[in-house]
Amino acid sequence: MIVQKKKHRSNRWLLEHFQDQYVKAAKKNNIRSRAWFKLEQLDKNNKIFKIGMNVIDLGAAPGSWSQYASNRIGKKGRIIACDILPIRPITGVDIFQGDFRNKKTLNLMLNTFSNITFHLVMSDMAPNITGNFSIDMPRIIELCKLALKISEHVLSKNGIFLLKSFQGEGFNELYKEIKMLFKKIKICKPKTSRTRSREIFILATR
């Protein structure tokens, strides 16, 4: 019965995915994933990007957020795209591959970019989803807190933190932690995010 339910969810997701207007638009316009449109909408509504920004993109694979950001910050800005998975090269984007849950890898990344002032840390990180929310949610929160830790270390004064999270157990605690570190906080759910998804975005400014 459990196997059948998982198969049903998987088939439903695949059907939705291939019928999705943003998936089709991404394919048509040589964009790496539909996540590009989420960031575009968040940016249009909140004016996140400015020319010359230095940006860290966490959970960057396959690279659609970095694709979008590189067009918005211009040649004077810099983007570091980070992920445990490999990312195909993107013009104007530096790529750092590693698992940031490993302290040595995390410290290596922080030390590598310690001389750069970052204006934006954006995180689209998510674990491999099992479909069991009691298992998935703690893993999601763990990655969110890791992104928050990185933002603490690298963000400039008035820096911006954009974080993807999910509503569920542990979210309220995470929100309180962010509220202690940032002056302005806004919770967003772009139209491009699927209606039944618990996915939300936190936009915080120092």
Curated annotation (Swiss-Prot):
The keyword Methyltransferase applies. Its EC number is 2.1.1.166. It comes from the Bacteria. S-adenosyl-L-methionine binds at residues 63, 65, 83, 99, 124. It is found in: Cytoplasm. GO terms for cellular component: cytoplasm. Disulfide bonds: none annotated. The active site is at 164 (proton acceptor). It is an enzyme of class 2 (transferase). GO terms for molecular function: rRNA (uridine-2'-O-)-methyltransferase activity. PANTHER family: RIBOSOMAL RNA METHYLTRANSFERASE, RRNA METHYLTRANSFERASE 2, MITOCHONDRIAL. Specifically methylates the uridine in position 2552 of 23S rRNA at the 2'-O position of the ribose in the fully assembled 50S ribosomal subunit. Belongs to the class I-like SAM-binding methyltransferase superfamily. RNA methyltransferase RlmE family. This is Ribosomal RNA large subunit methyltransferase E. It comes from Buchnera aphidicola subsp. Acyrthosiphon pisum (strain APS).
